[in-house]
Amino acid sequence: MKERTYIAIDLKSFYASVECRERGLDPLDTNLVVADESRTDKTICLAVTPSLKSYGISGRGRLFEVKQRVKEANAGRQHDAPGHKLDGSSCFHSELLKNPNLAIDFVIAPPRMAYYMEYSTRIYNVYLKYVAPEDIIVYSIDEVFMDVTDYLNTYKLSPHDLAMKIILDVLETTGITATAGIGTNLFLCKVAMDIVAKHIPADKNGVRIAELDEMGFRRGLWSHQPLTDFWRVGRGYAKKLEQNGMFTMGDVARCSVKNEDLLYQLFGKNAELLIDHAWGWEPCTVEAIKAYRPSTNSLGSGQVLHQPYTAEKAKLVLREMADSLVMDLVEKGLVTDQLVVTIGYDIENLTDPERRKKYCGDVVKDHYGRQIPKHSHGTQNLGRHTSSTKLILDATSELFDRIVNQDLLIRRLNIAANHVIDEASAPKPDAAFEQLDLFTDYAAREAEQKKEEADLERERKMQRAVLTIRRKYGKNAILKGMNLEEGATAKDRNEQIGGHKA
């Protein structure tokens, strides 16, 4: 079988770079963070420029963490400055290096998601100048995989030179620089980009390109820590592995030889993927990904509330989310027969002494290691495939009431529609056989079913009318009464993309 060559490209601090370019600033020399300051200092930073990261700031931290770290760095600069005094400030890395008397400053840019998507489309069109769409996997708004095996001979270029040519074209077209990884499979090119490229010096344009093959992976990364640096190894996986004496990919590879059963006990069938990656293997190709069709589908959304909500207010927000989910189903011509809801509780339930006394349930740790009440999770079967607003909202309310702890403050909500299928392929409600009996009034039941079907058809016409108006005038062109109640979030979220300002 022909050895394949893959390139992964990641646009460097993409959102932050776009904001710098639009301000006429150099993304490699400007301290800038993309965050919605109007949401308070606890808001998540979507991107941080490389110069600001050099002060030990995480690319996905909270805004208050950025401010705190800059404050600490300025305290250090003041201590080292002549006369222990800072005079003025600058957000430019080059100026800060030249003048130790300047305080570190930075720009806070509110996110503009629609604009970033437009930029991403322009960059994707640059990729299409070199590689056909069937050989590109769009992994995220700022990251792609390319199978360039059949292009190297055409362009008479090495993988490194082709990657550089594409990246420089993106830089010339948009002013955005990038990092690339080259590998003999998708896993290796991703790891080369995520891990190896970070440890090599950038060129004058800020470009880093790293390469890996299977043997290079084993020689260079079998001892790499932490495990969470590797693609698809999250905190949960790493914790389980460390509890069983495995701290590196080399440890996992050795365990797969000596005690493979242990890995399958820990991770089930997912152990096969972990073992492959530990050896630097990845059989999946771009072609296989393009051809994949999942056997089951779901559609869902999640929301982190700006402040802790009571159960009553959270129920309103969940109903709004269910209503939005229904309109997505209708627009795509889909139906569902099952809803899943997850309710995440706020840390204040345990930090407030009065609330803490009332709670006697399970306690877990959140992403930051803080103690919070265990989330509530439940499923509601609808009895038929449907996209009816009434049926789904009623089921959502019933499920919420059944699983929620009414005494706790709520911070997160998730809802998903499971077993989603095309409306045309959905089984009819009366298609199943049933045993007749003497005690059922079938005439009355048939009349009731006909009325229900007529009501659903009338509702469907209204849904389509609403969709038509919203497509033309925007999602807020038609709102429901619940969208105007105190605590409702749908109106604001309709003006967002991915939970951030459009």
Where are each of the predicted segments found?
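Gly/Gly-Pro- and Ser/Thr-rich, intrinsically disordered tail segments characteristic of DNA damage-repair
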Residues: M1-H277, E282-V286, A443-A502
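Residues at or immediately flanking beta-strands
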Residues: T177-T179, V340, N414
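Acidic, metal-coordinating catalytic segment for phosphate/diphosphate chemistry
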Residues: V18, G369-A502
